[in-house]
């Protein structure tokens, strides 16, 4: 389900703008100013990047998406995988008070309560206790082992804030005259729990993070005004190919996550699962992406990518291995025609898609495929009353449980399957890997049978990266930490 780590769609030149080798790094994130500076726990991609830069959690992610120390300088995991014990770095809060295990316990417990009602709370449901063991040692206990628990703890939403401030590694200031701009500078090494370093300011660069529309960001990059553009999606991908990008390159993350159409209501044409399946059967998924020229993008017909199971035979590549596309479409035609004959209504489906030229291309391709089976497609105006809504979301960790949690009925996003939720809930306390795998497979089967979602493939995330930018790496999580961009590479 993952495509090539660095997909070069514009040519890379050896000569870089020398002015970009020093001075502030200018970064544009495709986001709104309001979303960029959002507080709380429901963060846009831009806000995630800003939170990760200014408010660390126990651990963090490096440019390649690997877990690294943050407030916790080291940790151990017990042999049974049920206890994670962290030793905190010898450091202070911005007001000068020492960081203690009691502080972290309170902040983590508060954050877990704040997350209630979100999919991230479901991901964190294995946490049974947060204990302060000594002044700088804290323990998190789990209901059953979770190999990627540290990656989950590194999510920006788990960055810890006390009295309105985090512990860095960067500090933010804002310009009164520019509500879309955040200026970020590194904290001194000793305030980050590291040895003091003489003249450290001479080696660290400052960073300006600006929220922009996709078109504005691409134009600014082409004009040499920004060094890096983040948070490009399929909806905006055609904009990245506008104009000569001779001073940089497009990089596409090998993203893991959900990209498909969520069924909003069981009404009309979509009232029966067999007709929802008919729409899924009729799609030429590889053809949907062809207009974008994204080589290596792997379509999928499943909610949980088959590659996440240790045994590929547990989830074959195709849902309909004995049927080719033409055969599937003939079945879809019959099901749609039977409904039209029974009701006398026209088969029409409305889709809510984000703004952008990529959405127009995607809609056109879907309309072509469904038109072949007798279904007319409309774009929902303002998203109101849509039959289907695009779900475009990056995974936080590579387990079937993340995918299953995205359709939990408590989230009230669209159609769901209560029996799937119950199976995932049962798996929270199961220690045996084979039994847990069985529960996940049954939960996935329940969601598939309910036809709550029409999967298309992995999400698309692209960036524009100038050659002088260091410490940037495409990764499957789509998070690109800002702090390493400002640090010397030697």
Q: For the regions a protein language model found, what residue spans apply to each?
A:
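Gly/Pro-rich hinge or "lid" segments in bacterial periplasmic/extracellular proteins
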Residues: 144-207, 213-216
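Extracellular/periplasmic solute-recognition and catalytic clefts
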Residues: 177-185, 193-195, 208-266, 392
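Extracytoplasmic/peripheral linker and loop segments enriched in polar/acidic and small residues
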Residues: 17, 379, 402-467
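Aromatic- and charge-enriched surface segment that lines or borders ligand/interaction sites
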Residues: 74-117, 269-271
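N-terminal lobe/hinge region of extracytoplasmic solute-binding protein
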Residues: 29-79, 109
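Structural transition elements
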Residues: 298-339, 356-360
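Long beta-strand-rich cores associated with HINT superfamily self-processing modules
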Residues: 465-490
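Periplasmic-binding protein-like
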Residues: 266, 270-310, 362, 447-452
């Amino acid at each position: 389900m993952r495509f090539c780590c660095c997909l070069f769609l514009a040519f890379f030149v050896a000569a870089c703008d020398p002015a970009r080798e020093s001075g502030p790094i200018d970064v544009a994130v495709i986001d709104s100013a309001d979303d960029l500076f959002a507080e709380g726990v429901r963060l846009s991609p831009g806000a995630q990047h800003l939170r990760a830069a200014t408010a660390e959690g126990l651990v963090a992610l490096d440019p390649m998406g690997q877990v690294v120390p943050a407030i916790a300088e080291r940790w151990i995991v017990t042999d049974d995988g049920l206890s994670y014990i962290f030793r905190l770095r010898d450091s202070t809060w911005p007001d000068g008070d020492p960081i203690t295990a009691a502080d972290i316990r309170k902040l983590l417990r508060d954050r877990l309560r704040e997350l209630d009602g979100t999919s991230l709370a479901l991901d964190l449901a294995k946490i049974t206790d947060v204990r302060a063991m000594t002044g700088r040692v804290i323990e998190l206990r789990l209901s059953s082992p979770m190999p990627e628990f540290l990656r989950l703890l590194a999510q920006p939403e788990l960055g810890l804030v006390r009295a309105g401030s985090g512990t860095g590694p960067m500090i933010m200031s804002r310009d009164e005259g520019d509500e879309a701009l955040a200026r970020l500078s590194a904290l001194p090494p000793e305030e980050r729990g590291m040895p003091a370093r003489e003249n450290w300011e001479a080696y660290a660069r400052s960073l300006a993070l600006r929220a922009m529309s996709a078109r504005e960001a691409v134009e600014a990059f082409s004009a040499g005004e920004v060094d890096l553009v983040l948070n490009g999606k399929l909806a905006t991908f055609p904009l990245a190919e506008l104009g000569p990008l001779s001073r940089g390159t497009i990089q596409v993350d090998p993203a893991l996550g959900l990209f498909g159409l969520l069924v909003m209501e069981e009404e009309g044409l979509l009232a029966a699962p067999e007709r929802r399946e008919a729409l899924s059967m009729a799609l030429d998924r590889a053809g949907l992406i062809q207009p974008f020229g994204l080589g290596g993008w792997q379509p999928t017909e499943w909610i949980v990518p088959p590659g996440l199971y240790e045994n590929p035979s547990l989830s074959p590549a195709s849902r309909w291995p004995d049927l080719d596309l033409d055969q599937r479409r003939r079945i879809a035609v019959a099901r749609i025609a039977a409904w039209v004959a029974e009701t006398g209504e026209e088969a029409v489906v409305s889709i809510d898609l984000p703004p952008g030229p990529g959405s127009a291309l995607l809609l056109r391709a879907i309309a072509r495929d469904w038109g072949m089976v007798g279904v007319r497609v409309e774009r929902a105006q303002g998203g109101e009353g849509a039959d289907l809504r695009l779900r475009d979301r990056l995974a936080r960790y590579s387990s079937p449980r993340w995918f299953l949690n995205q359709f939990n009925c408590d989230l009230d996003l669209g159609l769901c399957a209560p029996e799937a939720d119950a199976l995932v809930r049962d798996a929270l306390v199961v220690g045996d890997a084979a039994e847990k795998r069985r529960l996940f497979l049954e939960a996935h089967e329940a969601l598939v049978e309910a036809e709550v979602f029409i999967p298309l493939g992995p999400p698309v995330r692209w960036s524009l990266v100038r050659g002088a930018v260091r410490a940037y790496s495409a990764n499957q999580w789509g998070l690109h930490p800002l702090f390493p961009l400002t640090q010397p590479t030697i």
